[in-house]
Every structure is written in structure tokens, then in C-alpha cells.
């Protein structure tokens, strides 16, 4: 019995050493240590041995089985390490090869213009105020001197959700909200960028969703001359140092007096061209002095405080600046269009 155990050990260790992969090694494990293997058979046949030999043969059988098990584990670890090394060799990276170029995106032209305008006014000391796109009727209309029954409240012009809730039609509600937070104490100096919504038919110059940037300054002794100086500086920074502006009388419910603001044409220098339609001037925004009713509803004493407000459409400015003839290009995600602005 002893000789058989020693021979089994020798054969098992020899086959373990010859195994070239994990499958072959597992076959050796099953052959020698499995339920039907020779080691198990020896242990089962110990009942036929004389009582005095059983302890010796049992101890030897366990010793042989332990030696085979240790050899299997050592060989398995070696084969697994060799497999890892083969995979690493096959997947080796040549660090001297040139990298694959990564296609980078670029800011959307509309985003570019909005950020440029924001940076310009932040440089003048303004802060950016943002608010909800789903707005109450009060802040969208009443707080801005648009009482019940005003044409701007027509269901055909605005996206109403309920009688008192709608998608904001301008970013002016943030002006009213900000003035309320100041509790009648100036100064207030903000710009309000964001998306707005109106019931409009989409075409080359109109969209049911577009962006606005509005500005507001409230303090003691604010005059129309302050408004003009601010907008002249804005026009020169955005369209070039040689630009001038002009005011034309207009009407907005929340400002009095109100003006339309034109900038001298940056394409023809005022001589007349297709961009300015031969006039030498391009309309870019609306503005005016904050209506006393708006100040009073926000908690400001209109006899002590005055202010000016202005509003512009970044889409129009981007169209003028980049020569874009259709507002729908901004929203159609056409890569052929967007790639034109990689180096603008």
C-alpha cells in the first residue's frame, strides 16, 4: 500500500509539472483528488488493512494528498501569471505612436454671443439674475405695469398653463423680483438672460422660443443720459469702437419715456447697405426709463429713485454679427452650420 501511494505521488507531481494550461491542470486534479481518484480508493480500502497499519497508511495517504494539492496550487498560480503576461504582451501599447486626434466641439454661436454680452456688462459692475421660465401672471404682467385686459395678455400671444401661470414672455419678471428683494433700497444693477416663449409662427425671423437679455439699473439720480452712455459703450464693445447709437421714441408699458435703440451700421459705416436696408442704422434693442408705477409696485419711492431698463434679443445680434439669415439655424443642430463657428 505504501509503495502505491508513493507511486501515485510521483505520477501526480510529474503530470502537474507537464501541464501547459489550466484545463490540463484541472484534469490532473480530478484524476488524482476526485471522488473516484486513486487516493480516495486507498482511503476507502483501509478497512481491509490490519488495525496496527491503518494509522500509518492513513497518515501517509493524507501526506500524499496534501503534497499533490500544494503542487496543484503552485502550478495554478504560475499558469495564471503566465496568462496575464501573455495578455499584457499582446495588448502592449507603443507610446511612441502618435495619438488619435480628438474631435473637439465649440460654443454654439448663440451661447457665444450671450456670454460675450454677459461678460461686457459684468465688467460694468452688473450682476446676473436668473429666474423661473414658468412664471406667475403677476410678475410677468401686473408688476410690470401691464394690467388685466392689456393686449399682451391675449391667449393668442402667450402660453398660459392656468389663468395665473404661464411660460414667461420676457425676462423682465426677474427685474420685478429683484427689486422686491431690495425692499425699496438701491442700488440695483442687473442683467437678466434667459429663454422666453411666445405664441408665434416659426419662420426666418420668428420663433416660439428664443432668448432675451434685459438690464435694469435703479438708484438715486439715474438719468436718460446714463442709459445712453451705457448703451453706447455696449455697442462699441460689441460691434466696434467706431459705432454710435441713436434713440427713436417708442412705447413700452414698463418704461416712460421709451425708446428704440439703433446702432450705426458696422458693415457700411453708415453709407447704406443691405444689412441696414440703406439707412445706415440697425435696430438692436428697446429701452427706457423705468415707469414710476413699476418702481412703486416693487416697493421703491419713485420720487427718490429712478432707473433705466433695456432689453435685447441675442438671436438678432448674433444674426447681425455673423451674417446669419435664418433664426431657425440656431435650433436645428445642423453640424454643417455649427462647424462654421469653430474659429470665429
Curated annotation (Swiss-Prot):
Reactions listed under catalytic activity: tRNA(Phe) + L-phenylalanine + ATP = L-phenylalanyl-tRNA(Phe) + AMP + diphosphate + H(+)
Domain of life (superkingdom): Bacteria
Cofactor: Mg(2+)
CDD domains membership: PheRS_alpha_core
Compartments where located: Cytoplasm
One Pfam family this sequence matches: Phe_tRNA-synt_N
A Gene Ontology term for the protein's cellular component: cytoplasm
EC number: 6.1.1.20
Cofactor comment: Binds 2 magnesium ions per tetramer.
Record keywords: Aminoacyl-tRNA synthetase, ATP-binding, Cytoplasm, Ligase, Magnesium, Metal-binding, Nucleotide-binding, Protein biosynthesis
GO MF assignments: ATP binding; catalytic activity, acting on a protein; magnesium ion binding; phenylalanine-tRNA ligase activity; transferase activity; tRNA binding
Residues noted as binding Mg(2+) in the record, renumbered to the chain: 256
Any Gene Ontology biological process: phenylalanyl-tRNA aminoacylation
Main location: cytoplasm
Enzyme class label: ligase
PANTHER family per the UniProt record, alphabetical: PHENYLALANINE--TRNA LIGASE, MITOCHONDRIAL, PHENYLALANYL-TRNA SYNTHETASE
Subunit structure: Tetramer of two alpha and two beta subunits.
NCBIfam families linked: pheS (TIGR00468)
Entry-linked HAMAP family: Phe_tRNA_synth_alpha1
Family statement drawn from the similarity comment of this UniProt entry: Belongs to the class-II aminoacyl-tRNA synthetase family. Phe-tRNA synthetase alpha subunit type 1 subfamily.
Designated name of the protein: Phenylalanine--tRNA ligase alpha subunit
Amino acid at each position: 500500500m505504501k509503495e502505491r501511494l508513493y507511486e501515485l505521488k510521483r505520477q501526480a507531481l510529474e503530470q502537474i509539472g507537464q501541464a501547459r494550461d489550466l484545463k490540463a491542470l484541472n484534469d490532473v486534479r480530478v484524476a488524482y483528488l476526485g471522488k473516484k481518484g486513486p487516493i480516495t480508493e486507498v482511503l476507502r480500502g483501509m478497512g481491509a488493512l490490519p488495525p496496527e497499519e491503518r494509522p500509518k497508511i492513513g497518515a501517509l495517504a493524507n501526506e500524499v494528498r496534501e503534497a499533490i494539492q500544494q503542487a496543484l496550487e503552485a502550478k495554478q498560480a504560475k499558469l495564471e501569471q503566465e496568462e496575464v503576461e501573455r495578455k499584457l504582451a499582446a495588448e502592449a501599447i507603443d507610446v511612441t505612436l502618435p495619438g488619435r486626434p480628438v474631435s473637439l466641439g465649440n460654443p454654439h454661436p448663440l451661447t457665444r454671443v450671450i456670454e460675450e454680452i454677459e461678460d461686457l456688462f459684468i465688467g460694468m459692475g452688473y450682476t446676473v439674475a436668473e429666474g423661473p421660465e414658468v412664471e406667475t401672471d403677476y410678475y410677468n404682467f401686473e408688476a410690470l405695469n401691464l394690467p388685466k385686459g392689456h393686449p399682451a395678455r391675449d391667449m393668442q400671444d402667450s402660453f398660459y398653463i392656468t389663468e395665473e401661470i404661464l411660460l414667461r414672455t420676457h425676462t423682465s419678471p426677474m427685474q420685478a423680483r429683484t427689486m422686491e428683494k431690495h425692499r425699496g433700497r438701491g442700488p440695483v444693477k442687473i442683467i437678466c438672460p434667459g429663454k422666453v416663449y411666445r405664441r408665434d409662427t416659426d419662420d426666418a425671423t420668428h420663433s416660439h422660443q428664443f432668448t432675451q437679455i434685459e438690464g435694469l439699473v435703479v438708484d438715486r439720480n439715474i438719468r436718460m443720459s446714463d442709459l445712453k452712455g451705457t448703451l453706447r459703450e455696449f455697442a462699441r464693445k460689441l460691434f466696434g469702437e467706431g459705432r454710435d447709437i441713436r434713440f427713436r421714441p417708442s412705447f413700452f408699458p414698463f418704461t416712460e419715456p421709451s425708446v428704440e435703440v439703433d446702432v450705426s451700421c458696422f458693415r457700411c459705416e453708415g453709407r447704406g447697405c443691405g444689412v441696414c436696408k440703406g439707412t445706415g442704422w440697425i435696430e438692436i434693442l428697446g429701452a427706457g426709463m423705468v415707469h414710476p408705477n413699476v418702481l412703486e409696485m416693487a416697493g421703491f419711492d419713485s420720487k427718490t429713485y429712478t432707473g433705466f431698463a433695456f432689453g435685447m434679443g441675442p438671436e438678432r445680434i448674433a444674426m447681425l454679427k455673423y451674417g446669419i439669415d435664418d433664426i431657425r439655424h440656431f435650433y436645428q443642430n445642423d453640424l454643417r452650420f455649427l462647424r462654421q463657428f469653430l474659429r470665429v
